[in-house]
C-alpha cells in the first residue's frame, strides 16, 4: 500500500443542545400541548444530562460523567436527548482510553442527523481505520469530502481552524483507507490533494515522502 497504517485520536467537539425548561403561569388557561412541548425532554432528563456535561467538561472527571450517563441510559433508554448522551459517552470513553467502546457508541448513532456531523464522521472514520475497518472508514471520510467537493483550493486556509483540520484529516484518512483497500491510484490522488490544499499541514511531510517513494 501507498500509505502505512497509523491511527489518529482527535476527540470530537461535542456540544449537546440541551433545551431550556419551559415556564408556567397559574392564571393562564390550559392549552393543548404544542408539538414542541410534546417533544421536549422532561426536566429530570435535562438535568441528568446537564450533570454529565458538567462532570465531563468542567470537573474533567470522565468516570463520574460515565456514571451519570449510565443512570441516564437506565432511566431514559429512548429519551429525547439519547443521541447527545451517546456522543457524551463516546467523548468520556475516549478520555479514558477506551477507544473500542467509544467506537461502539458512534456506530449506533445516525451522525448525519446531528450537529457538527463532519467532526463526528471524521472521528468515527479514524477509529474504524484504527481497527482495520477500512471500507467503513472510507465511507465516513467520503461523506465529509463530498460535502466540500465544490470548494476551491482556498479550502486549505479557511477562517475556521477546526474546519481546516477536519478536512485535512479526512483527506489523509481517505488516502490511508484507499491504500489499504488496494486503490493505490486513489491514495496517490488524495496525497497530492492533501499537499495542494495543505502544503504546511500536519500530514504534508509524510505525504510528500510517500509520493516521492511511489513515483
Which residues fall in each region the model found?
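Low-complexity, Pro/Ser/Thr
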Residues: 1-86, 91, 95-98, 108-111, ...
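Short, low-complexity, Pro/Ser/Thr/Gly-rich segments in the mature regions of secreted, periplasmic
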Residues: 206-214
Amino acid at each position: 500500500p501507498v500509505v502505512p497504517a497509523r491511527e489518529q485520536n482527535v476527540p470530537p467537539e461535542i456540544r449537546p443542545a440541551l433545551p431550556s425548561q419551559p415556564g408556567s403561569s397559574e392564571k393562564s388557561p390550559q392549552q393543548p400541548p404544542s408539538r414542541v412541548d410534546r417533544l421536549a425532554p422532561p426536566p429530570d432528563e435535562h438535568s441528568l444530562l446537564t450533570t454529565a456535561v458538567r462532570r465531563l467538561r468542567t470537573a474533567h472527571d470522565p468516570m463520574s460523567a460515565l456514571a451519570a450517563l449510565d443512570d441516564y441510559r437506565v432511566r431514559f433508554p429512548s429519551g429525547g436527548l439519547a443521541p447527545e448522551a451517546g456522543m457524551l459517552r463516546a467523548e468520556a470513553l475516549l478520555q479514558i482510553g477506551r477507544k473500542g467502546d467509544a467506537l461502539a457508541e458512534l456506530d449506533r448513532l445516525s451522525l448525519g442527523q446531528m450537529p457538527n456531523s463532519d467532526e463526528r464522521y471524521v472521528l468515527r472514520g479514524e477509529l474504524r481505520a484504527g481497527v482495520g475497518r477500512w471500507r467503513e472508514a472510507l465511507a465516513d471520510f467520503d461523506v465529509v469530502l463530498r460535502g466540500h467537493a465544490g470548494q476551491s483550493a482556498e479550502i486549505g486556509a479557511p477562517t475556521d481552524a477546526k474546519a481546516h483540520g477536519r478536512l485535512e484529516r479526512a483527506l489523509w484518512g481517505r488516502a490511508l483507507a484507499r491504500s489499504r483497500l488496494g486503490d493505490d491510484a486513489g491514495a496517490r490522488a488524495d496525497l497530492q490533494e492533501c499537499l495542494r490544499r495543505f502544503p504546511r499541514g500536519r500530514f504534508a511531510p509524510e505525504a510528500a515522502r510517500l509520493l516521492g517513494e511511489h513515483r
